[in-house]
């Protein structure tokens, strides 16, 4: 049973919010809503639920007519996330993704489920659009850098070269007619961390809607699937706090509904090795953790799209990244970089339309 909070019929902007994991000093999602008040049914109550999923705390905030409906909807949403994790996880030994990775180099195509096919297909398209900057075959490199962080020691050029030999999105062969995937090179390891969470959040929101709860927000690790606005509000309120003054009051407010929201970057997830700072995000071309200190926010029609774009922008930078966003329908992005002591902010032309009115 998911842990739940007591219902609150009239939240205020000062109430406790959802902290985006790893970005708490910069991004705060308030559980109160924002915007001008409009007449809404008074019967709806606000409920919160939290449960560990995909190695992160997943939180659901929803408005429902009763505790029973809220409980049923949240339970079903968390169950859906757990089921997807068993497909997408690269930690579980018996997940569908792990079994596919184990088949690498076998020379045989492997039938995959509709859920895994959807992500593999999106990954291939995003890799092509980004000229390989987005690449789910980075698993061997991710493993190298996880070990480097634990041991506090840079990987050797030989270790990186060996891992890179097993990386490359073109090494995955998809057959759309047979719905199969084949990993050409032995020792390949797929890592869906850049998109699996977005898909899971979208699906959780879809389940809530199917249970008659459209006024909801689902968040995990700084990413969100956002449904209809809370009662009497225009949208869910997002605070953007200044990066150059941690702990300072927020300087900007967004109002969001019916969209996906994703964050990526190294401002709060990095490691210093050999006197240099490296991001947890790996550049598939160089095999190295990113060293360009950046933080990216993407707003898109769904969290899956936002998730894939935010990671890609971190790798290719603001100029190419915002061009990619401009070519994606209804997507906008904000890129914050910190070269030296100054903070640089670049935004899509349409990002300002999400500002709270």
Could you tell me what each predicted segment is?
Residues 2-11, 18-357:
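Mature catalytic core of soluble alpha/beta enzymes
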């Amino acid at each position: 049973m998911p842990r739940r909070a007591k219902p609150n019929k009239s939240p205020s902007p000062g109430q406790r919010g959802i902290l985006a994991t790893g970005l708490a000093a910069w991004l705060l999602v308030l559980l109160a809503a924002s915007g001008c008040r409009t007449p809404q049914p008074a019967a709806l109550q606000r409920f919160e639920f939290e449960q560990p999923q995909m190695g992160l705390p997943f939180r659901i905030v929803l408005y429902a007519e009763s505790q029973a409906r809220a409980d049923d909807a949240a339970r079903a949403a968390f169950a859906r996330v757990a089921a997807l994790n068993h497909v997408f996880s690269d930690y579980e030994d018996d997940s569908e993704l792990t079994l596919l990775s184990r088949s690498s180099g076998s020379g045989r195509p492997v039938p995959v489920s509709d859920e895994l096919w959807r992500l593999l297909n999106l990954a291939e398209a995003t890799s092509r659009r980004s000229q390989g900057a987005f690449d789910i075959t980075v698993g061997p490199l991710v493993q190298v850098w996880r070990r480097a962080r634990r041991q506090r020691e840079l990987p050797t050029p030989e270790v990186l070269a060996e891992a890179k030999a097993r990386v490359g999105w073109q090494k995955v062969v998809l057959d759309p007619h047979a719905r199969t995937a084949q990993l050409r090179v032995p020792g390949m390891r797929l890592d869906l961390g850049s998109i699996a969470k977005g898909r899971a959040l979208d699906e959780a929101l879809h389940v809530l809607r199917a249970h008659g709860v459209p006024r909801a927000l689902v968040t995990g690790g700084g990413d969100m699937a956002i449904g209809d606005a809370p009662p009497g509000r225009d949208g869910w309120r997002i605070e953007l706090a200044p990066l150059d003054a941690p702990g300072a009051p927020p300087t900007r407010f967004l109002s969001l509904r019916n969209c996906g929201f994703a964050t990526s970057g190294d401002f709060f997830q990095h490691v210093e090795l050999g006197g240099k700072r490296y991001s947890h995000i790996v550049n598939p071309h160089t095999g190295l953790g990113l060293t360009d200190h950046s933080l990216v926010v993407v707003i898109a029609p769904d969290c899956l799209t936002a998730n894939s774009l935010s990671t890609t922008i971190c790798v290719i930078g603001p100029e190419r990244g915002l061009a990619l966003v401009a070519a994606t329908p209804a997507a906008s992005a904000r890129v914050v970089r910190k070269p030296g002591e100054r903070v640089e902010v670049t935004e899509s032309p349409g990002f300002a339309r999400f500002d709270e009115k």
